[in-house]
Amino acid sequence: MMLPIFAVLVGIVIGLLFPISLPAEYGKFLAVALLASLDSVFGGLRAGLEEKFDNPIFISGFFVNALLAVLLVFIGDRLGIDLYYVASLAFGLRIFQNLAIIRRYFLKK
């Protein structure tokens, strides 16, 4: 449990020491990829609490979800349709659902 917390802290420190600015055009893509990644993280946390965690499934889901979300936004951008709203809504709902299940787990424990 300490390794993920340590990794997050190291990531925050690296992000503060080496600020990288991205063009505004990538904002939609980055936001949806971040939501997809957070969905995978909270899903992995939920699976760990339910003792169903499988590392290859987590890692592949992490990257595949992010790539598919970015691909969906890219296709929508090319078609002139704001599909990032759909992806944001879907991943946001899944994040809140996973958080609710995690919360219930700790409250019942």
Question: How should each PLM-predicted stretch be described?
Answer:
Residues 15, 32-43, 69, 73, ...:
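Alpha-helical transmembrane segments of multi-pass membrane proteins
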Residues 25-38, 84:
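Structural signature of hydrophobic alpha-helical transmembrane segments
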Residues 1-6, 29-30, 54-64:
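Cytoplasmic-side transmembrane-helix entry/capping segments in multi-pass membrane proteins
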Residues 42-51, 97-105:
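C-terminal ends of transmembrane helices
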Residues 86-109:
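Canonical alpha-helical transmembrane segment with a positive-inside/aromatic-interface signature
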Residues 71-86:
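Membrane-helix boundary connector in multi-pass membrane proteins
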Residues 18-26, 44-55:
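Short juxtamembrane and helix-loop transition motifs at transmembrane-helix boundaries
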Residues 1-27:
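Membrane-helix boundary elements
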